[in-house]
A protein has these predicted regions:
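Transmembrane alpha-helices
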Residues: 11-12, 17-24, 139, 147-151, ...
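Interhelical loop and adjacent transmembrane-helix boundary motif
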Residues: 2-5, 49-58, 200-250, 254-257, ...
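Membrane-interfacial helix termini and adjacent extracytoplasmic/periplasmic loops
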Residues: 37-42, 46, 112-142, 173, ...
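A structural signal for multi-pass alpha-helical bundles of membrane permease subunits
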Residues: 22-36, 64, 115-126, 193-198, ...
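Loop-to-helix entry region at the N-terminal start of transmembrane alpha-helices
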Residues: 17, 60-67, 117-145, 185-187, ...
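Transmembrane alpha-helix signature in integral membrane proteins
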Residues: 32, 56-87
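C-terminal transmembrane helix and the adjacent membrane-cytosol boundary/short C-terminal tail
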Residues: 2-12, 85-87, 91-95, 151-162, ...
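Short membrane-interfacial helix/loop motifs at transmembrane-helix boundaries
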Residues: 22-56, 207-212
Length: 271
């Protein structure tokens, strides 16, 4: 007989959630504070969000972050999908363990180590650090997350759908484009959104690989906070939290859609 949650478990859960989310809630609330003093409540106001629109440096950093996020997410989606296809479809090829380890290494490797390694690489090949080096760094970081999402979908994929298409004379490439790709498209889109949100709030890798004219939004926020917390920082952080949360919700919905398609496809085939 299953026991219900004890008071200790409920208390521990409540304290854990409070420890994680109360500071975020305070930041969001104080982003609407009318007072310039961040510790003194002066009433509700959208003043600091309006002032963000006139902060040229912050807007430039936001644009740089958006461009890097879109490019790195697109590159990570393509490379991660190809890596997932190789790991699932090619079986136990020679070097599979090494290949998989290299793909998933950023999951377990501290970002400081990854950032330092990339910095040494860029210095060794004499590449000017800036927009493109950050893009490469973020692609390296997010590729593994895309590979995990797509690989999980491919592992549950019904290969008989592809076999039926090829039995009807459909060539392999057309089979992939018309049968496989539409069914794994939600997983690919979910991986793209996840990679984009991870790129948006990365600070460590960007700090190692940034250069002149490539100040991302997290770096800009960090440099501003070192001089003291301002109400504008609360506002821009609230916007970042909202964007990342929305991205994670979209990724979760797409992942569920991918699973639902995978479950319904065999039924349609049998019919």
């Amino acid at each position: 007989m299953r026991k219900g949650p004890t008071w200790f478990n409920v208390t521990a859960l409540a304290l854990g959630l409070a420890f994680l989310y109360v500071p975020i809630a305070i930041l969001v609330v104080y982003s609407f504070n009318a007072s310039r003093l961040v510790t003194v409540w002066g009433g509700w106001s959208m003043r600091w969000y309006v002032e963000l629109l006139h902060d040229a440096a912050m807007l430039e950093s936001a644009l740089v972050t958006l461009r890097i996020g879109l490019l790195s997410a697109a590159a990570a989606t393509v490379l991660g999908t190809l890596a997932a296809l190789a790991l699932v479809r090619f079986g136990r090829f020679r070097g599979r363990i090494l290949f998989g380890g290299m793909i998933y290494a950023p999951l377990v490797m501290p970002e400081v180590i990854t950032g330092l390694s990339l910095l040494l690489l860029f210095v060794a090949v004499d590449v000017d650090r800036g927009f493109w080096t950050i893009t490469v760094a973020h692609t390296t970081l997010t590729l593994c997350f895309v590979a995990i999402v797509v690989q999980a979908r491919l592992a549950d994929f019904d290969r008989s759908l592809e076999e039926a298409a090829m039995d009807l004379g459909c060539p392999p490439l057309k089979t992939f484009l018309t049968v496989t790709l539409p069914l794994i498209a939600p997983a690919i889109a979910s991986g793209f959104v996840l990679a984009f949100t991870l790129s948006l709030d990365d600070l460590i890798l960007a700090s190692f690989t940034t250069g002149p004219g490539a100040t991302t939004l997290p770096i800009r926020i960090y440099s501003e906070v070192r001089l003291g917390v301002k109400p504008e920082i609360n506002a821009v952080c609230t916007i970042l939290i909202a964007v990342v949360a929305a991205g994670l919700v979209v990724a979760s919905l797409m992942s569920k859609l991918s699973g639902a398609r995978g479950e319904s496809a065999p039924i349609g085939t049998q019919a």
